[in-house]
């Protein structure tokens, strides 16, 4: 169900220069809540972005009848532990602690934690307790904000 929601939401978001970064269907509430997280990579994600996305996505979901029962649609921007995906993220969060996960062990590790110092075409760079680390981008599965300093 969530993959279908994301497939429907992505082109709606693109109309407003937004991207869908995740979706969750919380069935432990009554009525259930469908939360879709969006991000504006050109500017801070604002309430207006969420409102536009909510109105447009609601129409698409109703038309497709994804959820025949009653539900609540929430559109929000992601918080801490957010994946860094676009150039703006890597600039905005320079100096912040991040967790880098690799597809396979790189220098013996699947995970690297350090302060983000940059990203270029080839590498994501971290400072790990004063030691610079360069991880090849092709080895990286994901980069996300981390809640603890090095």
Swiss-Prot record:
Any Pfam family matching the protein: RimP_N
Keywords for the protein's UniProt record, in alphabetical order: Cytoplasm, Ribosome biogenesis
Cytoplasm among keywords: yes
Cysteines engaged in disulfide bonds, as pairs: none
One GO BP annotation of this record: ribosomal small subunit assembly
Amino-acid biosynthesis found in the keyword field: no
Gene3D superfamilies membership: RimP-like superfamily, N-terminal
Localisation: Cytoplasm
Gene Ontology CC terms, in alphabetical order: cytosol
Entry function: Required for maturation of 30S ribosomal subunits.
Family membership noted in the UniProt record: Belongs to the RimP family.
HAMAP family the record matches: RimP
Protein name: Ribosome maturation factor RimP
Gene: rimP
């Amino acid at each position: 169900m969530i993959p279908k929601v994301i497939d429907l939401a992505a082109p709606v978001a693109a109309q407003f220069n937004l991207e869908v970064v995740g979706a969750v269907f919380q069935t432990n509430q009554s009525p259930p809540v469908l939360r879709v997280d969006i991000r504006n990579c050109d500017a801070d994600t604002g309430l207006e972005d969420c409102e536009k996305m909510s109105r447009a996505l609601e129409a698409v979901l109703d038309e497709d009848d994804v959820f025949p029962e009653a539900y609540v649609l929430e559109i929000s921007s992601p918080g801490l532990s957010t994946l860094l995906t676009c150039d703006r993220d890597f600039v905005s969060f320079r100096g912040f602690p991040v967790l880098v996960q690799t597809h396979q062990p790189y220098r013996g590790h699947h995970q690297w934690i350090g302060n983000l110092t940059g990203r270029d075409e080839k590498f994501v760079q971290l400072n790990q307790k004063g030691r610079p680390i360069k991880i090849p981008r092709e080895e990286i599965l994901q980069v996300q904000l981390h809640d603890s300093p090095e």
